[in-house]
């Protein structure tokens, strides 16, 4: 068993390493964005020079890859930094959920679903869960998740809201999709879970595209 002082030193080292890693990722993201600008300029020159279609297609794929990499690094930097919530009392969770569902059917039991939430961040988290971490909503032919919102009452902890998704197109993973960090989708789900927990809530996956989130209400 390690002495307490050694354990504290190890913890401090990990914190410092985490901060340094976030800064390195941030710098790499800026470099990728710079490369994307150069590649975009090059594509414009190639278009004016009427270069062959296969060359233009190649440079287009390069730009798209640089953009995906920069976006993933942005998500990683956000996840690694402290979460700052701008809470607003009496924020309507039902409204946020309907907007985040992007046309998917949302079933509610009625009643009030107001809480002390950061509307922008919570809406982002709900949208990312509904999409299964994808950067855009699933195509119409793929179908979407079914969403249900219910209110729970407890004598000790007070009222809470339970959001249940069925049919979420979560990325393939052997473990918890909120801890996989697998590509952009995994990072978005991990950030969504962090936002939910930052509001005092819980998030867990039941498998088979079933996800549940519980959030405290006023």
What are these regions (language model features)?
Residues 111-116, 120:
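A short, conserved loop immediately preceding a beta-strand within the C-terminal catalytic
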Residues 156-186:
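Glycine-rich/acidic phosphate-handling loop/turn and adjacent ATP-lid/helix
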Residues 38, 54-103:
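Conserved DHp (HisKA) dimerization/phosphotransfer helix of two-component histidine kinases, i.e.
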Residues 188, 192:
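Short alpha-helical Gxxx[C/S/T] motif in the catalytic ATP-binding
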């Amino acid at each position: 068993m390690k002495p307490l002082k050694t354990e504290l030193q190890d913890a401090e080292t990990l914190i410092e390493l985490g901060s340094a890693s976030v800064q390195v990722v941030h710098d790499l993201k800026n470099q990728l964005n710079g490369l994307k600008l150069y590649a975009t300029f090059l594509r414009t020159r190639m278009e004016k020079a009427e270069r062959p279609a296969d060359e233009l297609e190649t440079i287009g794929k390069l730009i798209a890859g640089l953009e995906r990499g920069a976006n993933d690094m942005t998500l990683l930097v956000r996840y690694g930094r402290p979460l700052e919530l701008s809470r607003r009392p009496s924020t309507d969770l039902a409204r946020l959920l309907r907007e985040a569902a992007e046309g998917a059917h949302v079933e509610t039991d009625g009643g009030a679903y107001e809480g002390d939430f950061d509307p922008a961040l919570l809406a982002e988290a709900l949208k990312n869960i509904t999409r299964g971490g994808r950067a855009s909503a699933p195509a119409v032919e793929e179908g979407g998740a079914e969403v249900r919102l219910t209110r729970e009452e407890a004598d000790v902890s007070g009222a809470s809201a339970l959001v249940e998704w069925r049919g979420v197109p979560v990325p393939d993973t052997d473990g918890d999709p909120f801890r996989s960090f697998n590509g952009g989708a995994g990072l978005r789900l991990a950030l969504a879970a962090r936002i939910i927990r930052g509001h005092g809530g819980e998030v867990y996956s039941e498998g088979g595209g079933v996800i549940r989130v519980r959030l405290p209400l006023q």
